[in-house]
Structures are given as C-alpha cells and as structure tokens.
Amino acid sequence: MTSKIIVALDYEKEAEALALVDQIDPSLCRLKVGKEMFTTLGINFVKQLHQRNFDVFLDLKYHDIPNTVARAVRSAADLGVWMVDLHASGGLRMMEEAKKILEPYGKDAPLLIAVTVLTSMEDLDLLQIGINASPMEQVLRLAHLTQRAGLDGVVCSPQEVEILRNACGEDFKLVTPGIRPIGTDFGDQRRVMTPTAAIRAGSDYLVIGRPITQADNPAEVLRSINVSIG
C-alpha cells in the first residue's frame, strides 16, 4: 500500500458506506472510521472493511485518564487497525502509556497519532477554552509533546505541515484533514488546501471525505487525486 489518501467514511447507514467502499480500490486508499460510524456500527463494520482488504484508520480521538486510553488503544490494536489516534491535550503521561501498551505488537502495532488542534478551531475558539495562543503555536507545542512521548506523528492542518516538518523531522508522520480538490466546497473545515499543495508542503497522508464520497463517480475522483499527487 503506497497511497497517501485516506477516505473519510462519514455515513449514517452501513449499506450506504459499503456501497461507496465497493466502488473503490483498496490499493488506491485507506479508510477512516470516526466516532459516529463506530458508535453506530461497531467493530463488525471495521471487520467488513478488513475483509475487503482496506487498511483502517480508527479515528476515535481518545482522551481520558492514561490507563483508560492505553486499554482502548490496545483494543484497537487487537482489532487490527492500521492507525489510531488520541488527543495530545490529554498529556504526556497519557500518550506514553498508550505507546507503551503497543510494544508487544511489534511491527503489527498500529500507527499511533495525536490530534493537536481541530481544523475547525480558530484563535477565538482556543481563547474561549483558556488557551491564549494561535492555532499554530498550540499545534507546535502539542506536536513537540507528542514526539517526546514517542508517538508516530500528528494530525494537523495542511498550512501547518511545513513548519511541523522542519520542527519534528522527516520521520514524524503528518496526517492532514482539510483537503479539498479545486472546485469543491470547504464544508466545516476552516484551514484547507488542495491535495497537490498539501503533498508539496510535506504531508504524509491526506484525509478526504465529501469530495470523494459525494462524487458522482467516486472511483474516478480517487484515481484522479492519486494521479495529481504522483
């Protein structure tokens, strides 16, 4: 699997999600399952995606006491997902315990990624929760904390990629939502970029939802994006 594209499955019904999944090639993307779908459909849905040979990013953004998060991460590893995430704002100890619990899995452990600042958040949103810093300042602070904890990388907006790449090095994975091909709606993302621009900036993986899932021909859009990013 070499594709950098992660397709976000944001559906209410299993049948609708699988109808989309059955139109696309697992060699051209991975799939992201978030809170809504996982809460509704559970682990059996993830298993169905695995049966179709898709790698799965389990996007549940764990944020709790260290022991609880570590156990949840272990459960995700047992499920066989490719990537799982947690909130860096849960703190260093929470992240360290989550990383440590994956050690017995060796090369079969999922990538463990931290969420820094949600891409919908702006300066005012941070100020309202007591953080007197710009989104970029907070992202950089949490990315350094994530790296200190030994995690594999962070989720960040495309505009933050170049700074994070320089600050954290080439081996630190950068997963970027807020990806919109030219001519598509920005939706509820506030900090967005085209796929080509994001890859040039240094993104490792691009999370793309509606531009693919709501397209008349999802397979063709996916193929086109893969071609555009090389």
Curated annotation (Swiss-Prot):
One Gene Ontology term of the molecular function aspect: orotidine-5'-phosphate decarboxylase activity
Keywords for this protein: Decarboxylase, Lyase, Pyrimidine biosynthesis
Protein's pathway: Pyrimidine metabolism; UMP biosynthesis via de novo pathway; UMP from orotate: step 2/2
Active-site residues, record numbering mapped to chain: K61
Catalytic activity: orotidine 5'-phosphate + H(+) = UMP + CO2
Keyword Lyase: yes
Transmembrane segments: none
GO biological process: 'de novo' pyrimidine nucleobase biosynthetic process; 'de novo' UMP biosynthetic process
EC numbers, comma separated: 4.1.1.23
InterPro entries, alphabetized: Aldolase_TIM, OMPdecase, OMPdecase_AS, OMPdecase_bac, OMPdeCOase_dom, RibuloseP-bd_barrel
Pfam families: OMPdecase
Any one Gene Ontology cellular component term annotated for this protein: cytosol
Enzyme class: lyase
Binding-site residues, substrate: 10, 32, 59-68, 119, 180, 189, 209-210
Coiled-coil annotated residue ranges, if any: none
Cross-referenced PANTHER family: OROTIDINE 5'-PHOSPHATE DECARBOXYLASE (PTHR32119:SF2)
Family per record: Belongs to the OMP decarboxylase family. Type 1 subfamily.
Record text on subunit structure and interactions: Homodimer.
Described purpose of this protein according to its UniProt entry: Catalyzes the decarboxylation of orotidine 5'-monophosphate (OMP) to uridine 5'-monophosphate (UMP).
Protein name, entry field: Orotidine 5'-phosphate decarboxylase
Species classification: Bacteria, Pseudomonadati, Pseudomonadota, Gammaproteobacteria, Pasteurellales
